[in-house]
C-alpha cells in the first residue's frame, strides 16, 4: 500500500483503474471507524460499474495512516475538508472529482463542496450527518460500552494498525459536550454540484431528517434522495446493488 503526506500526516491510499486516463475520478471518504481495508471490495465494484477511476484513502488516525497524537477538536471535519483533502487531491493530480462519502466522510464531502472554491463534479452523500441527533448520541454511547465490554477492539484490528486511536478519536469527540451543537447546514447553500443523498430508513446513527435537510438546504444544487428500506447505517453493505445502481444512473447523467 503506498503512502502520501497531506496536512503533515502520512496517509495510506490506493488508486483504482488509474490507467483509465479519460475516466472521471471517484474519491471515497470513509466512515468514522472506517479505513481503506474497511471498504473491502465495494470501491472496486462501484468503479467497475461506473467506468470511473478511484481513490481510496485512510484519514489521519485510521487504517495504516498516522495515528492520532491528540484528541480531535469539534471542527475536525472542517479541517479535513479544507486542508487534508485538497492537499491529497493536489498531490495526486486529481481535479473535479466525484466525491463518495459515507457517514463522517459524507459530511466531509459536503463541507468540501460547500466551503471551498475547488471544482467538484458531483457528490454522493451516504448516511451523512449534517447535525447531531439524539439517536446518534445513543448509538455512539452504546459503541462506547461495547468497546469496554466486548471484543470490539479485536474486531477492528484487521482494519486499523492502532484500533485505540481509531475508536477513541471517533467516539470521544462525538460524545464531547462541545460537539452536541455541531451543525453544518450553513455550508449547504455553497454546494453547486449535483448531489445524491442516500440513507437507510433504519439507520441507527441518524434519521431521514439528515438527508431531507440536505435537500432543503442545498438550494443551489440539484439534489436527489434515495431512502432505502431494510437498511441501516451502511447502505453499501445492506443494499449494495441498490446503491451501485443508483450511483451508476447518477454519474451517467452528469455532463
Show where each model-derived region lies.
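Short alpha-helix in the alpha/beta-hydrolase fold that links the catalytic acid
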Residues: 193, 207-216
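Short beta-strand/loop motif that positions the catalytic acidic residue
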Residues: 191, 197-199
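Conserved hydrolase catalytic core segment
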Residues: 95-133
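Catalytic histidine-centered segment of alpha/beta-hydrolase-like enzymes
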Residues: 231-240, 244
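Active-site loop/oxyanion-hole signature of alpha/beta-hydrolase fold enzymes
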Residues: 50, 56-96
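Acidic catalytic loop of the alpha/beta-hydrolase fold
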Residues: 202-206
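Conserved HGGG/HGGXW glycine-rich cap/lid loop of the alpha/beta-hydrolase fold
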Residues: 12, 16-67
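Catalytic histidine neighborhood in serine/cysteine hydrolases
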Residues: 216-233
Amino acid at each position: 500500500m503506498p503512502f502520501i503526506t497531506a496536512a503533515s500526516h502520512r496517509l495510506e491510499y490506493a488508486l483504482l483503474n488509474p490507467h483509465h486516463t479519460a475516466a472521471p475520478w471517484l474519491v471515497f471518504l470513509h466512515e468514522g471507524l472506517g479505513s481503506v481495508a474497511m471498504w473491502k471490495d465495494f470501491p472496486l465494484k462501484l468503479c467497475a460499474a461506473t467506468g470511473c477511476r478511484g481513490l481510496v484513502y485512510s484519514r489521519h488516525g485510521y487504517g495504516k495512516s498516522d495515528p492520532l497524537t491528540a484528541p480531535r477538536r469539534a471542527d475536525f471535519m472542517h479541517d479535513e475538508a479544507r486542508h487534508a483533502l485538497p492537499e491529497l487531491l493536489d498531490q495526486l493530480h486529481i481535479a473535479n472529482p466525484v466525491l463518495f462519502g459515507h457517514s463522517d466522510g459524507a459530511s466531509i464531502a459536503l463541507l468540501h463542496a460547500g466551503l471551498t472554491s475547488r471544482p467538484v463534479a458531483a457528490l454522493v452523500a451516504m448516511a451523512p450527518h449534517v447535525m447531531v441527533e439524539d439517536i446518534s448520541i445513543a448509538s455512539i454511547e452504546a459503541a462506547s460500552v461495547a468497546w469496554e465490554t466486548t471484543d470490539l477492539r479485536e474486531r477492528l484490528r484487521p482494519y486499523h494498525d492502532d484500533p485505540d486511536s481509531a475508536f477513541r478519536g471517533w467516539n470521544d469527540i462525538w460524545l464531547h459536550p462541545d460537539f452536541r451543537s455541531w451543525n453544518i447546514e450553513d455550508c449547504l447553500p455553497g454546494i453547486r454540484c449535483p448531489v445524491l443523498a442516500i440513507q437507510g430508513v433504519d439507520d441507527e446513527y441518524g434519521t431521514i431528517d439528515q438527508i431531507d435537510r440536505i435537500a432543503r438546504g442545498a438550494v443551489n444544487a440539484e439534489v436527489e434522495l434515495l431512502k432505502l428500506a431494510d437498511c441501516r447505517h451502511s447502505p453499501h453493505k445492506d443494499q449494495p446493488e441498490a446503491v451501485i445502481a443508483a450511483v451508476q444512473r447518477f454519474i451517467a447523467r452528469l455532463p
